[in-house]
Amino acid sequence: NMSMREKYAAALDRIVEECPVYINDGELIVGSASLGDAILPVVPVKYEGNYVFGWGANHVTMGFDEALRKGLDAYEREIDGYLSADRDAERTEVRISMKRALASLRRWHQRYMEALEEKIKTDPQERLKRIRDNLKTVPFAPPQTFYQALQSLWFSFAFARLSANWPGLG
């Protein structure tokens, strides 16, 4: 008997494992909400042909500016600090679900890094190496260049869409 937050975290784990990872010719950044139903504002996970959750969150403005300045590792450290101090069950469950969402984002990032490494083995274009080097630390650490900032913002935005949160960029 899982809570809705636990079900969502499990769904997000499934999404990041099942979604196709695309590295398209000519593109200079990566990240795509590529799981078929992610084009709709729904959590793209079905059970016996039906959506598990229905509609996702829409028309939200996320704190991309702060995520860019601090990097997502800083958020995780804050969550850990709250978890070690908080004794409220509801807040603890929310924060654990936040950590699970970050873990899913890390796995999705890892899949992109692996795909880039594989593609570079057969097609060692400088463009692909630059994308790989650019993606290596973002969105977890603050970007050091404008190019990293673009990649960090886009990757975070695409992950939000993939997880059924349709944000505006600003």
Show which residues each predicted segment covers:
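Catalytic cofactor-binding cores of redox enzymes
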Residues: N1-G170
